[in-house]
Amino acid sequence: ATEELKEFFAKARAGSVRLIKVVIEDEQLVLGASQEPVGRWDRDYDRAVLPLLDAQQPCYLLYRLDSQNAQGFEWLFLAWSPDNSPVRLKMLYAATRATVKKEFGGGHIKDELFGTVKDDLSFAGYQKHLSSCAAPAPLTSAERELQQIRINEVKTEISVESKHQTLQGLAFPLQPEAQRALQQLKQKMVNYIQMKLDLERETIELVHTESTDVAQLPSRVPRDAARYHFFLYKHTHEGDLLESVVFIYSMPGYKCSIEERMLYSSCKSRLLDSVEQDFHLEIAKKIEIGDGAELTAEFLYDEVHPKQHAFKQAFAKPKGPGGKRGHKRLIRGPGENGDDS
């Protein structure tokens, strides 16, 4: 959060503000708008909240009630994620939600509401929320929190472009050039594919399919951007010549933005599902790296063919007693009893 927003939060908690709108700009939480109280909280609600809900842009709203607890005035936390907003924005706002609550002070927040259409966050919508919470066998606060998290994770609209979010990941559609490259890899017409996410168009784009050998592979990995790579790894193993498709996800750490890291990680599993199921390409190994220098010939071989560890015998023969000992004699010889006879 910016210093301006932190200072405004401190001022607002004193009670002089009715509503705070928080948005994300340049990966920072900033103050979007604010309003002062006019009348009672229930009469101010729709007039203050509804005009600030943009049909394309998610946001967070903090709405002050007139009730107080030990820490001061109580607030509602409203998370707005409209159906028509880009999927990447929905994910970014969902991932930052806990940070906003922490910056404001969770002890001041009495209740939370999530909405994708204005009716969800209207005063009538809040009344329905209160009624459901007061129904028989109410959920505990922990259960309500878990339920809200699950709703946030799956409540993303599926669009005609087939990009959609599920608990298993996010799917951006493959552009035609990328699809053709995968077909060529299956037919072994190319041996290397590099792909990237187009964050604006929300698609997976082909970067290039330049012929690549193991020695060249490290130089194909950008040092300042994430990429997906498919490599036809030709090698010998136990006397056999093999051609194994290896998937490499390269993410150069914190040189990439939070949004980029989040989207690449989330899209990865759905991309691999599509490659294996739709293009019938068997992925021999899936590798994640931070630097191209990791892709040595030895590293690739060990990843595709992990060394087998030998196991010790489960029941080892017990060891004998230590030291050198002769056989124990059970019968004494003459004169050993102390008799002279």
From Swiss-Prot:
Domain ADF-H: 1-131, 169-305
Residues with the Phosphoserine modification: S341
Keyword annotations of the record: Acetylation, Actin-binding, Cell projection, Cilium biogenesis/degradation, Cytoplasm, Cytoskeleton, Phosphoprotein, Repeat
Subcellular location: Cytoplasm, Cytoskeleton; Cytoplasm, Perinuclear region; Cell projection, Stereocilium
MF-aspect GO terms: actin filament binding; actin monomer binding
Annotated Basic residues bias: 322-331
PTM description: Phosphorylated on both serine and threonine residues.
UniProt modified residues of type N6-acetyllysine: K6
Region (Disordered): 314-341
Gene3D superfamilies (UniProt xref): Severin
InterPro entries on file: ADF-H, ADF-H/Gelsolin-like_dom_sf, Twinfilin
BP-aspect Gene Ontology terms: actin filament depolymerization; barbed-end actin filament capping; cell projection organization; positive regulation of neuron projection development; regulation of lamellipodium assembly
Modified residues (Phosphotyrosine): Y301
GO cellular component: actin filament; myofibril; perinuclear region of cytoplasm; stereocilium
SUPFAM superfamilies the UniProt entry points to: Actin depolymerizing proteins
PANTHER family membership: TWINFILIN, TWINFILIN-2
Known role: Actin-binding protein involved in motile and morphological processes. Inhibits actin polymerization, likely by sequestering G-actin. By capping the barbed ends of filaments, it also regulates motility. Seems to play an important role in clathrin-mediated endocytosis and distribution of endocytic organelles. May play a role in regulating the mature length of the middle and short rows of stereocilia.
Subunit details: Interacts with G-actin; ADP-actin form and capping protein (CP). May also be able to interact with TWF1 and phosphoinositides, PI(4,5)P2. When bound to PI(4,5)P2, it is down-regulated. Interacts with MYO7A.
Similarity comment text for this entry: Belongs to the actin-binding proteins ADF family. Twinfilin subfamily.
Protein name from the UniProt record: Twinfilin-2
Organism expressing this protein natively: Pongo abelii (Sumatran orangutan)
Source organism phylogeny: Eukaryota, Metazoa, Chordata, Craniata, Vertebrata
